[in-house]
Amino acid sequence: MENFYNISPDYNTFMNIVITGASKGFGRAIAEIYAAHGHHLFICSRNEIALYKTVEELLTRYPDTKIKAKARDLSRKEEVADFAEWLLANAYHIDVLVNNAGRFIPGSILNEADGALEEMLHTNLYSAYQLTRLLLPSMIKRKSGHIFNMCSIASLNAYPNGGAYSISKFALYGFSKNLREELKPYQIKVTSVLPGAAYTDSWSGSNIDPKRIMEAGDIAAMVYTASQLSPQACVEDIILRPQLGDL
Protein backbone atom coordinates (compact mmCIF):
# COMPACT_ATOMS: atom_id res chain seq x y z
CA MET A 1 0.00 0.00 0.00
CA GLU A 2 2.90 2.40 0.50
CA ASN A 3 3.61 2.49 -3.24
CA PHE A 4 0.04 3.59 -3.84
CA TYR A 5 1.07 7.20 -3.22
CA ASN A 6 4.23 7.18 -5.33
CA ILE A 7 2.69 8.79 -8.39
CA SER A 8 4.48 11.11 -10.80
CA PRO A 9 5.15 14.72 -9.66
CA ASP A 10 2.29 17.21 -9.61
CA TYR A 11 1.76 19.52 -12.54
CA ASN A 12 -0.08 21.82 -10.14
CA THR A 13 1.23 22.70 -6.70
CA PHE A 14 -1.13 23.05 -3.75
CA MET A 15 -4.39 22.63 -5.60
CA ASN A 16 -7.68 23.26 -3.80
CA ILE A 17 -9.60 19.99 -3.76
CA VAL A 18 -13.31 19.72 -2.88
CA ILE A 19 -14.54 16.23 -1.99
CA THR A 20 -18.07 15.37 -0.91
CA GLY A 21 -18.82 12.19 1.01
CA ALA A 22 -15.24 12.29 2.25
CA SER A 23 -15.50 10.52 5.61
CA LYS A 24 -15.35 6.95 4.29
CA GLY A 25 -15.03 4.75 1.23
CA PHE A 26 -13.95 6.26 -2.06
CA GLY A 27 -14.19 9.81 -0.74
CA ARG A 28 -11.88 9.06 2.17
CA ALA A 29 -9.36 7.31 -0.10
CA ILE A 30 -9.39 10.22 -2.55
CA ALA A 31 -8.94 12.71 0.29
CA GLU A 32 -5.97 10.73 1.56
CA ILE A 33 -4.09 10.62 -1.73
CA TYR A 34 -4.47 14.37 -2.25
CA ALA A 35 -3.43 15.02 1.36
CA ALA A 36 -0.38 12.81 0.85
CA HIS A 37 0.70 15.11 -1.98
CA GLY A 38 0.20 18.26 0.07
CA HIS A 39 -2.90 19.66 -1.57
CA HIS A 40 -5.47 21.75 0.27
CA LEU A 41 -8.68 19.88 1.08
CA PHE A 42 -12.21 21.16 1.53
CA ILE A 43 -14.30 18.17 2.51
CA CYS A 44 -17.87 17.39 3.42
CA SER A 45 -19.92 14.55 4.88
CA ARG A 46 -23.31 14.26 6.50
CA ASN A 47 -21.79 12.46 9.52
CA GLU A 48 -20.07 15.15 11.58
CA ILE A 49 -18.30 12.74 13.94
CA ALA A 50 -16.88 10.62 11.12
CA LEU A 51 -15.92 13.74 9.16
CA TYR A 52 -13.83 15.31 11.90
CA LYS A 53 -12.30 11.97 12.76
CA THR A 54 -11.15 11.81 9.15
CA VAL A 55 -9.68 15.32 9.42
CA GLU A 56 -7.83 14.39 12.60
CA GLU A 57 -6.40 11.20 11.12
CA LEU A 58 -5.30 12.84 7.88
CA LEU A 59 -3.63 15.74 9.67
CA THR A 60 -1.81 13.29 11.91
CA ARG A 61 -0.44 11.44 8.89
CA TYR A 62 0.10 14.52 6.72
CA PRO A 63 0.69 17.50 9.03
CA ASP A 64 1.79 19.79 6.20
CA THR A 65 -1.51 19.64 4.36
CA LYS A 66 -4.39 22.04 5.01
CA ILE A 67 -7.87 20.65 5.57
CA LYS A 68 -11.16 22.43 6.16
CA ALA A 69 -14.35 20.49 6.73
CA LYS A 70 -18.06 21.18 7.00
CA ALA A 71 -20.74 18.65 7.90
CA ARG A 72 -23.71 18.94 5.59
CA ASP A 73 -26.37 16.62 4.16
CA LEU A 74 -26.14 17.29 0.43
CA SER A 75 -29.39 15.46 -0.29
CA ARG A 76 -30.99 18.68 0.99
CA LYS A 77 -30.90 21.57 -1.46
CA GLU A 78 -30.55 24.24 1.23
CA GLU A 79 -27.53 22.46 2.71
CA VAL A 80 -25.92 22.22 -0.73
CA ALA A 81 -26.32 25.98 -1.06
CA ASP A 82 -24.82 26.53 2.40
CA PHE A 83 -21.85 24.30 1.60
CA ALA A 84 -21.25 26.07 -1.71
CA GLU A 85 -21.35 29.48 -0.02
CA TRP A 86 -18.84 28.25 2.57
CA LEU A 87 -16.55 26.91 -0.17
CA LEU A 88 -16.55 30.13 -2.15
CA ALA A 89 -15.78 32.10 1.01
CA ASN A 90 -12.93 29.83 2.13
CA ALA A 91 -11.27 28.67 -1.08
CA TYR A 92 -9.61 31.28 -3.27
CA HIS A 93 -10.40 29.04 -6.20
CA ILE A 94 -11.45 25.44 -6.81
CA ASP A 95 -9.16 23.26 -8.87
CA VAL A 96 -10.79 19.86 -8.43
CA LEU A 97 -14.37 19.00 -7.46
CA VAL A 98 -15.11 15.37 -6.63
CA ASN A 99 -18.87 14.76 -6.49
CA ASN A 100 -18.77 11.61 -4.40
CA ALA A 101 -21.70 11.99 -1.98
CA GLY A 102 -24.01 9.06 -2.46
CA ARG A 103 -26.00 6.26 -0.94
CA PHE A 104 -26.77 2.67 -1.87
CA ILE A 105 -30.06 0.98 -1.00
CA PRO A 106 -30.67 -2.33 -2.78
CA GLY A 107 -34.13 -3.25 -3.98
CA SER A 108 -36.16 -4.12 -7.04
CA ILE A 109 -38.36 -1.54 -8.74
CA LEU A 110 -41.47 -3.49 -7.81
CA ASN A 111 -40.67 -4.15 -4.17
CA GLU A 112 -38.48 -1.28 -2.95
CA ALA A 113 -39.94 1.13 -0.43
CA ASP A 114 -42.08 4.00 -1.61
CA GLY A 115 -39.86 7.06 -1.92
CA ALA A 116 -36.68 5.07 -2.61
CA LEU A 117 -36.23 6.62 -6.04
CA GLU A 118 -36.66 10.14 -4.73
CA GLU A 119 -34.14 9.47 -1.97
CA MET A 120 -31.58 8.03 -4.39
CA LEU A 121 -32.02 10.89 -6.85
CA HIS A 122 -31.65 13.55 -4.16
CA THR A 123 -28.49 11.94 -2.78
CA ASN A 124 -26.80 10.51 -5.87
CA LEU A 125 -27.84 12.99 -8.58
CA TYR A 126 -29.26 16.26 -7.30
CA SER A 127 -26.41 16.81 -4.84
CA ALA A 128 -23.85 16.74 -7.66
CA TYR A 129 -26.06 18.69 -10.05
CA GLN A 130 -26.82 21.48 -7.60
CA LEU A 131 -23.32 21.83 -6.14
CA THR A 132 -21.73 21.87 -9.59
CA ARG A 133 -24.10 24.59 -10.80
CA LEU A 134 -23.26 26.77 -7.80
CA LEU A 135 -19.48 26.39 -8.20
CA LEU A 136 -19.25 26.56 -11.97
CA PRO A 137 -19.37 30.36 -12.36
CA SER A 138 -16.09 30.73 -10.46
CA MET A 139 -14.50 27.95 -12.53
CA ILE A 140 -15.74 29.41 -15.80
CA LYS A 141 -14.39 32.82 -14.83
CA ARG A 142 -10.91 31.29 -14.40
CA LYS A 143 -11.34 28.90 -17.36
CA SER A 144 -9.86 26.17 -15.23
CA GLY A 145 -10.95 23.22 -13.13
CA HIS A 146 -11.63 19.51 -13.13
CA ILE A 147 -14.89 17.86 -12.07
CA PHE A 148 -15.07 14.18 -11.17
CA ASN A 149 -18.49 12.57 -10.90
CA MET A 150 -18.49 9.29 -9.01
CA CYS A 151 -20.78 7.12 -11.05
CA SER A 152 -20.73 3.32 -11.01
CA ILE A 153 -20.68 0.20 -13.12
CA ALA A 154 -24.39 0.40 -12.28
CA SER A 155 -24.42 3.50 -14.53
CA LEU A 156 -23.71 1.22 -17.49
CA ASN A 157 -25.36 -2.12 -16.79
CA ALA A 158 -28.72 -2.95 -15.27
CA TYR A 159 -28.80 -5.79 -12.76
CA PRO A 160 -31.37 -7.52 -10.50
CA ASN A 161 -32.15 -5.50 -7.37
CA GLY A 162 -30.43 -2.44 -8.82
CA GLY A 163 -33.69 -0.54 -8.67
CA ALA A 164 -33.61 3.11 -7.69
CA TYR A 165 -29.86 3.05 -7.08
CA SER A 166 -29.02 1.98 -10.62
CA ILE A 167 -31.55 4.44 -12.05
CA SER A 168 -29.93 7.29 -10.12
CA LYS A 169 -26.45 6.25 -11.28
CA PHE A 170 -27.57 6.08 -14.92
CA ALA A 171 -28.88 9.62 -14.45
CA LEU A 172 -25.64 10.81 -12.86
CA TYR A 173 -23.67 9.46 -15.81
CA GLY A 174 -25.98 11.32 -18.19
CA PHE A 175 -25.42 14.51 -16.21
CA SER A 176 -21.66 13.99 -16.34
CA LYS A 177 -21.59 13.36 -20.10
CA ASN A 178 -23.69 16.45 -20.82
CA LEU A 179 -21.52 18.53 -18.52
CA ARG A 180 -18.41 17.38 -20.36
CA GLU A 181 -19.78 18.70 -23.66
CA GLU A 182 -20.96 22.00 -22.19
CA LEU A 183 -17.66 22.82 -20.49
CA LYS A 184 -15.23 22.09 -23.31
CA PRO A 185 -15.14 25.76 -24.44
CA TYR A 186 -14.17 26.84 -20.91
CA GLN A 187 -11.17 24.50 -20.52
CA ILE A 188 -12.89 22.74 -17.62
CA LYS A 189 -12.41 18.99 -17.57
CA VAL A 190 -15.14 16.52 -16.62
CA THR A 191 -14.42 12.89 -15.77
CA SER A 192 -16.98 10.17 -15.06
CA VAL A 193 -15.69 7.53 -12.64
CA LEU A 194 -17.38 4.14 -13.00
CA PRO A 195 -15.99 1.63 -10.50
CA GLY A 196 -17.12 -1.89 -9.90
CA ALA A 197 -17.03 -3.51 -6.48
CA ALA A 198 -14.31 -2.22 -4.16
CA TYR A 199 -13.75 -3.05 -0.50
CA THR A 200 -15.06 -0.25 1.72
CA ASP A 201 -16.87 -0.08 5.06
CA SER A 202 -20.09 -1.12 3.35
CA TRP A 203 -18.60 -4.60 2.86
CA SER A 204 -17.53 -5.06 6.48
CA GLY A 205 -19.33 -7.97 8.08
CA SER A 206 -19.99 -9.60 4.73
CA ASN A 207 -18.54 -12.89 3.57
CA ILE A 208 -16.79 -11.34 0.58
CA ASP A 209 -13.08 -12.02 0.25
CA PRO A 210 -11.36 -8.61 0.10
CA LYS A 211 -8.98 -10.04 -2.50
CA ARG A 212 -11.94 -10.78 -4.80
CA ILE A 213 -12.74 -7.10 -5.26
CA MET A 214 -10.78 -3.88 -5.68
CA GLU A 215 -9.36 -1.57 -3.02
CA ALA A 216 -10.77 1.92 -2.58
CA GLY A 217 -7.22 3.14 -3.14
CA ASP A 218 -7.32 1.80 -6.69
CA ILE A 219 -10.08 4.24 -7.57
CA ALA A 220 -8.35 7.08 -5.71
CA ALA A 221 -5.12 6.46 -7.63
CA MET A 222 -6.93 6.72 -10.95
CA VAL A 223 -8.70 9.93 -9.96
CA TYR A 224 -5.47 11.50 -8.79
CA THR A 225 -3.56 10.49 -11.91
CA ALA A 226 -6.29 11.83 -14.20
CA SER A 227 -6.07 15.20 -12.42
CA GLN A 228 -2.33 15.42 -13.11
CA LEU A 229 -2.39 15.32 -16.90
CA SER A 230 -1.52 18.27 -19.12
CA PRO A 231 -4.22 20.93 -19.64
CA GLN A 232 -4.88 19.67 -23.17
CA ALA A 233 -5.72 16.11 -22.04
CA CYS A 234 -8.98 14.98 -20.43
CA VAL A 235 -9.82 11.49 -19.23
CA GLU A 236 -13.53 11.30 -19.97
CA ASP A 237 -14.33 7.93 -18.38
CA ILE A 238 -12.55 5.84 -15.77
CA ILE A 239 -13.93 2.29 -15.75
CA LEU A 240 -12.48 -0.13 -13.22
CA ARG A 241 -13.57 -3.66 -12.44
CA PRO A 242 -12.18 -6.41 -10.23
CA GLN A 243 -9.65 -8.55 -12.08
CA LEU A 244 -12.04 -11.51 -12.00
CA GLY A 245 -14.93 -9.38 -13.22
CA ASP A 246 -18.10 -8.10 -11.59
CA LEU A 247 -19.65 -9.99 -8.70
Tell me the role of every PLM-derived stretch.
Residues E48-I49, A71-D82, D114:
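The beta1-alpha1 cofactor-binding region of Rossmann-like NAD(H)/NADP(H)-dependent oxidoreductases
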Residues H37-K53:
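Conserved glycine-rich Rossmann-like NAD(P)H-binding loop of the short-chain dehydrogenase/reductase
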Residues T132, S168:
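Active-site helix of classical SDR
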Residues S23-G25:
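Conserved glycine-rich cofactor-binding loop
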Residues S152:
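Residue(s) in the substrate-gating loop at a strand-loop-helix junction
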Residues P185-I188, S192, I208-L247:
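C-terminal helical subdomain
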Residues S108-I109, A116-L121:
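Substrate-binding pocket helix/loop in short-chain dehydrogenase/reductase
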